[in-house]
A protein has these predicted regions:
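C-terminal structural segment of proteins
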Residues: 1-277
């Protein structure tokens, strides 16, 4: 039962959606609704107006950008679609793996790429995969379209009057992998990691063990050049500031820091094996 009252509009196109967001204080975007609707029911969030963008075809589909250098993943692409898309599987496998690991089939069928990225909390999988891929998000707002690094989006909320329209991922990216340990009941990550091995060194992003999804540049620097033996990876994690890792439900910060280090070593070794093929 939703206890608060609000208005509801289903805009015909993106321009109408943007006008509604700009013209109504307290307007919120409704897409998959996996985070917003439970929060409205519980009273954790409020809205004066729900702008339902679920039928905006322009925000769907996975394509290549005109110059062929990036994949453009529409914000309304569901997690189930992302997990099985041939282009994503071939060129951004950590994104497909993160989508597969997200929740149960019902969550994946309803949840969207845009919603998962905007949520960007401690218990979301897709932001770390996007950060490891060096992806950017495309935002549409009153001033036109802009881009923002996925890492910057995870650090703070998107503008309230903007709509996340797409995720842009470098095409044919370097070897990558995603690993996760999840709560059996909720499928929320206890911790998760995504990695890519680039010519300049590894890119590593983690969630669950930290207060929000983070790139671990200190760990990346310590591991530059590899090889990615488990003990070397764990030593790189132990060198991080103790306060970086935060306790979870029934788990200590020290344990989570160790666990995410083990997962990162596993992911790096898988990506390294792919690089050798």
């Amino acid at each position: 039962m939703i206890l608060t009252e609000f208005d509801y509009v289903r805009p015909a196109d993106l321009d109408e959606a943007l006008a509604l967001l700009a013209g109504t204080r307290g307007a919120r975007i409704l897409a998959g609704g996996q985070s917003l609707l439970p929060d409205l029911r519980s009273g954790a969030d409020r809205a004066a107006l729900l702008v339902d963008i679920r039928r905006l075809a322009e925000l769907r589909a996975v394509t290549r950008t005109p110059d062929g250098t990036r994949l453009r993943i529409g914000a309304l692409t569901t997690l189930a679609e992302l997990a099985t898309d041939p282009l994503v599987l071939a060129e951004a496998p950590e994104l497909a793996a993160a989508a597969r690991a997200n929740g149960d089939p019902q969550v994946r069928n309803l949840g969207t790429v845009g919603g998962n990225l905007v949520a960007a909390g401690r218990a979301t999988d897709l932001p770390v995969a996007a950060m490891a891929a060096d992806a950017v998000v495309e935002l549409a707002g009153p001033g036109g379209r802009t881009t923002l690094a996925a890492e910057e989006l995870a650090a703070g909320p998107a503008p309230a009057d903007a709509v996340l329209t797409a995720l842009l991922v470098p095409a044919a990216g370097p070897p990558a992998a995603f690993e996760k340990t999840a709560d059996r009941a909720t499928r929320y990550p206890v911790c998760a990691t995504a990695v890519r091995i680039t010519p300049g060194g590894p890119r590593i992003a983690v969630t669950g063990a930290t207060s929000r999804p983070l790139r671990l540049r200190g760990v990346e620097d310590r591991l530059r050049g590899g090889p990615y033996r488990t003990e070397a990876v764990l030593a790189a994690f132990r060198a991080e500031p103790r306060e970086l890792f935060v306790p979870g439900r029934g788990t200590s910060a020290e344990y989570l820091g160790h666990l995410v280090g083990v997962l990162t070593a596993r992911a790096l070794q898988r990506a390294e094996q792919a690089l050798a093929r």
